[in-house]
């Protein structure tokens, strides 16, 4: 991701704010084409949200996030969201999975431990 892309940074900050207001999360990662500097005009933001509560349904959380993201006014880069609880995400990070790649190479947009 180009650090001087002001529009991208503003959009990602707005996405992060919407997500943190929607769900009690541990971490939010950006991954995919914007991290790898392979984005094109039609690229979307790939966002992975790690939630605290194991009892919450990740699919229900995703739906709430999408609903709140859809309320943004004006033109925006599309957002693709994945949600998983902290324990499962951390376990998947020990295996050769997408989650491990995200934890190692993704851009950490939010970490509850750093914002406290």
What are these regions (language model features)?
Residues 46-50:
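Short beta-strand->loop micro-motif that forms the acidic, two-metal-ion catalytic signature
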Residues 1-27, 35-41, 51-116:
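Catalytic core of pol beta-like nucleotidyltransferases
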